Swiss-Prot record:
Residues 594-672 form the Carrier domain. It comes from Paxillus involutus. Residues 58-462 are annotated as: Adenylation (A) domain. This is Inactive atromentin synthetase invA6. The modification O-(pantetheine 4'-phosphoryl)serine is found at residue 631. Belongs to the ATP-dependent AMP-binding enzyme family.
Length: 952
């Protein structure tokens, strides 16, 4: 088999590349990663590694020089040697922040160990435990280096040796000149990476010092890196693009680097532009789905057009999935709008690569505005120096395809991995003739340039992450209405679609001409969508019911995804799709109410935009949260509606109370006409009203608001109503003056909403104590309270309450206006000022973009501070007393104590106030994060299990 002769990729349309790159590569000849590290420190000690963390709402950048980072990593390595692990031991490195991951990897290498970078673990407990057990068995043992949050996620798996970075730091000392780092050989294992596990449990990709060096040399030459270059990365460090492509490759050439947690950019898209300007960034990386999202979000910041100096940026690499040409062009146009130089040009370089190829190995950098792309997706171009590619017949894996004809893409070169760890069978099957790596992708090479045309493997890529079709199908098969073993899911991408999706084919258990077919089909499709969203965060593009007698299986009894997709693309399933739409239309028609007033129609268009629906499909009876609305969407709806209706403010709580279009329209009309009287205070805020199981009432945390519960409430759709209890005072009402007054008001609100028990009530943090008091009052009225959930709060809280200054700073921290450390450092100096002066200082220090995002004015912020202060004052005089029938206590990692001390010395005291034995349940995350986006899916499962265990 003869590979296609391709010249290495070169950089087009900019002056970043110079002869200095090749001269530097020649001058420096490291043969291991530690050579790269020590050479960079020696030649460029003052060059920088900078970081923006997930908690840096204030845009602060933390920086270490190469020299400082070297000392830090060596100190960690010195402490690591005390573990007594044999040289070559595998250490699983598990962090979310770039700096932690980076320091851990270099410390492992310096100490003679092999780091294995672990991506974020699944929130599905069974899958997570299965994965961790698989990794442990693969390595024969498992040492995990992580933080307290990571340790909490894996604590239930037996046999793990869990080491904390905080403990390693505590033992680390300044290392003297006599410290001798490990001296590896070029072919030793360097870093291990996990595949996505898209076809089962993850495989472990072994990269040696030699493969990584070959890749980084070639990447640096392609990118035109020099010691004067400055790069920015916002891909996770556990991904080869984040660690090899955007850290080790620039380090090889001595380039300064900025690593930004993706949440920091998504929270404030303009930060991407500011960082490019402030740090004079020349090279950046962003996958296709982030390019698309960044474009959409930045387009809303038109007031910043022409405000940024973006002249430094020379190239933006993109990969992870096919890059839509229109997306790349829209992104480049958006950057041009923001640039001070109206003639600025931007090179977007789509790339192909896998974990097995050290990320990108084929590139096509072009100025997409100057050279319009020829195809729907950007071409992927030509391979890096040393890499070869070929297209072959996928049936035999050997016969070359002619130019312009699609087939299986294979690559070979020194940057290709050497093997899968402890998996010779998978290694052998991944190579042809021992050298050509089978990527599993279908591609076309035409006139020397490659472009992708599909995939052989059974995976779907959502936002750059691969998900296994087989595992998704396993869960979809459990849906009522699906005939067992007659369901298939297949990846699919419509023309112009920004990211890949999938289609579900299945045979229903009921006849499609039966009288109740519309209702049954609607319920089945809704359940299939719910499972899909919970499994892979994306609903299917199409669900196609096919009668059993028309769903053909192979001789081995399997459905052919390829055949089904081909039938779908060729229009052969159009009659089934039309029949399903007809039945679903009948089902929807039973409840569909066309928006009638202009306000309803405007809100209908807004709902359609937020949830990517056809305007004609939006009913006046549609509920914002049942459509999938989350806490971020609430803020978006609030902003857009205020703009469309030219209103100074629509209260967030009113959106929560009026999520149905017709109801919200009436409220908006009352604001527009200015004849709406202020509603009487009602603490009960309905977040979810579907189904008829016992409702859950959740009391607000210490800041008084209930937005923290919006994402949690979504998981109770079609199961039970979910009500939040919100404090008095946000609309100008008088504050509560005691815990008794507050609890009595909430108990009365719960009784108005649900006149009779049994009740289920819970509260997070401060709200847990209030929930306990509400439950006592309900029981004293003769009602049964079958569930009382207390989330991470002890019974005695008086000494935990903040004074006014600390309360104000704590609120600012929780709102993302400053870090916890900054809040603690600021407290002493603020206490010397009056309250008015303290607030003025705090307001000036708050990042404007975050204030805008929260739509906070000085008046609203000050009022919120007084509300939180009022709650704190109620807590200062509170002493628990009496008892309730049951208690379920949930606890996370505390800010200061160990989890064991937090449980045993504080939380277990709830036993003194319960007439039965309380249950104590561990939940993932820290106190401040246990209900955030990363943890809420895990928390809800534990919480719902507890409700069911109480017979609810």
């Amino acid at each position: 088999m003869a590979p296609v002769a391709i010249t290495p990729a070169t950089l087009v349309g900019h002056d970043l590349k110079s002869s200095r790159a090749s001269e530097r590569a020649t001058e420096l000849s490291p043969v291991t990663l530690l050579d790269i590290f020590s050479r960079a420190v020696s030649l460029y000690p003052k060059h920088e590694l900078s970081f923006v963390t997930s908690s840096a709402h204030d845009s602060s950048v933390q920086t270490r020089s190469f020299s400082e980072f070297d000392q830090y990593a060596r100190a960690l390595a010195w402490a690591m040697l005390a573990w007594g692990k044999p040289t070559g031991s595998v250490i699983v490195v598990y962090f979310t922040e770039h700096e932690d991951n980076m320091a851990a990897v270099w410390a492992c290498l310096l100490a003679g160990h092999v780091p294995c970078l672990q991506p974020a673990l699944s929130e599905q407990q069974a899958h997570k435990e299965g994965h961790v057990a698989h990794i442990k068995n693969l390595f024969s043992s498992a040492t995990w280096l992580t933080n307290e949050s990571g340790a909490e996620q894996v604590h239930s798996i037996t046999g793990l040796d869990i080491r904390l970075l905080s403990e390693l730091k505590a033992r680390a000392e300044t290392v003297g000149a006599d410290f001798h780092a490990h001296q590896p050989n070029p072919d030793d294992e360097a870093i291990l990476f996990l595949t996505s596990g898209s076809t089962g449990f993850s495989k472990v990709v072994v990269h040696t010092h030699r493969t990584i060096l070959a890749a980084c040399n070639a990447k640096g030459q392609s990118y035109g890196l020099t010691s004067e270059s400055k790069t920015m990365n916002w891909v996770g460090f556990d991904h080869v693009a984040g660690s090899l492509e955007m850290h080790i490759a620039p380090l090889l050439y001595g380039a300064s680097q900025l690593h930004v947690h993706v949440s920091a950019i998504l929270a404030d898209p303009s930060r991407f532009l500011r960082l490019i300007e402030e740090k004079s960034i020349q090279l950046a990386f962003a996958p296709n789905f982030l390019l698309a999202k960044l474009t959409r979000d930045l387009e809303k910041c038109s007031d910043l057009f022409g405000k940024f100096d973006l002249s430094s940026i020379k190239r933006i690499n993109s990969g992870g999935e096919a890059v839509v040409s229109s997306t790349a062009q829209a992104f480049a146009r958006t950057l041009k709008n923001f640039a001070k130089d109206g003639n600025a040009s931007f090179v977007i370089s789509a790339g192909f690569g896998t974990t097995e190829t050290c990320a990108g190995c084929i590139y096509d950098p072009i100025d997409v505005l100057f050279t319009p792309p020829s195809y729907e997706f950007l071409e992927l171009g030509t391979p890096l120096t040393g890499c070869e590619m070929c297209i072959v017949n996928p049936q035999d894996g050997v016969t070359p395809r002619p130019d312009g004809e699609s087939g299986e893409l294979q690559v070979r070169g020194p940057m290709v991995f050497v093997r899968y760890y402890n998996d010779p069978k998978a290694t052998t099957s991944s190579f042809i003739e021992g050298v050509w790596y089978r990527t599993g992708d279908v591609g076309i090479i035409e006139k020397g340039k490659m472009r992708l045309n599909g995939r052989i493997k059974d995976t779907v890529i959502v936002h750059g992450v691969s998900y296994g079709i087989a595992e998704l199908e396993t869960y979809l098969q459990t849906v009522e209405g699906v005939t067992h073993s007659f369901l298939a899911a297949a990846p699919h991408r419509d023309p112009g679609q920004e990211t890949e999706g999938f289609v579900i084919f299945y045979s229903p258990t009921f006849e499609l001409d039966s009288e109740d077919a519309p209702a049954k089909l609607y319920a089945t499709h809704r359940a299939l969508r719910d499972v899909s969203v919970k499994m892979i965060t994306l609903p299917p593009q199409q669900i196609i019911p096919i009668p059993l007698n028309q769903m053909e299986k192979t001789t081995l009894g399997k459905l052919s995804r390829v055949c089904l997709v081909n039938l779908f693309k060729q229009g052969e399933l159009a009659n089934h799709i039309a029949r399903a739409e007809e039945l679903l239309s009948i089902a929807r028609g039973a409840t569909f109410i066309a928006p009638s007033t202009e306000t309803e129609k405007t809100l209908g268009r807004l709902y359609a935009e937020i949830f990517n629906l056809r305007v004609s499909d939006v009913s006046a009876s549609d509920n914002f949260f049942e459509l999938g609305g989350n806490s971020i969407d609430v803020i978006k709806l609030k902003r857009e509606a205020e703009s469309l209706f030219e209103l100074p403010e629509i209260l967030t709580v009113q959106i929560l109370k009026h999520p149905v279009i017709s109801s919200l329209a009436k409220y908006v009309d009352s604001l527009v006409s200015k004849d709406g009287s202020q509603e009487e205070y009602d603490p009960v805020v309905p977040l979810q009203l579907t189904s008829n199981k016992t409702p859950i009432f959740m009391v607000h945390p210490g800041i008084g608001e209930v937005l923290a519960y919006v994402d949690l409430a979504k998981y109770f759709q079609n199961e039970r109503p979910f009500f939040a209890l919100r404090v008095r005072g946000f609309e100008g009402q008088p504050l509560f003056t005691s815990m008794d007054e507050m609890a009595s008001s909430y108990a009365a609100g719960a009784k108005r909403t649900q006149p009779h028990g049994p009740y289920a009530i819970a509260g997070y943090s401060y709200g847990g104590v209030v929930a306990f008091e509400v439950a006592k009052r309900l029981e004293s009225m003769g009602d049964e309270v079958k569930f009382i959930g207390l989330v991470d709060i002890p019974p005695h809280i008086a000494d935990r309450m903040h004074d006014w200054t600390s309360g104000m700073l704590n609120l600012s921290h929780l709102l993302g206006l400053m870090s916890k450390q900054d809040a603690d450092n600021l407290a002493p100096s603020l206490r010397t000022l009056t309250r008015k002066e303290q607030f003025e200082v705090l307001w000036k220090l708050s990042p404007p973009e975050r204030l805008t995002e929260l739509q906070l004015t000085p008046e609203k912020h000050e009022n919120w501070v007084y509300i939180a202060g009022g709650l704190s004052e109620c807590g200062m005089t509170y002493q628990p007393g009496g008892s309730v029938s049951v208690l379920d206590v949930f606890y996370a990692m505390p800010p200061h104590d160990t989890k064991e001390d937090w449980l045993n010395q504080h939380l277990r005291r709830w036993a003194d106030f319960c007439r039965s034995e309380p249950s104590f349940t561990n939940v993932p995350g820290h106190h401040d994060t246990l209900m955030d986006f990363d943890h809420v899916s895990g928390f809800q499962k534990i919480f719902r299990d507890a409700l069911e265990a109480r017979g609810l």
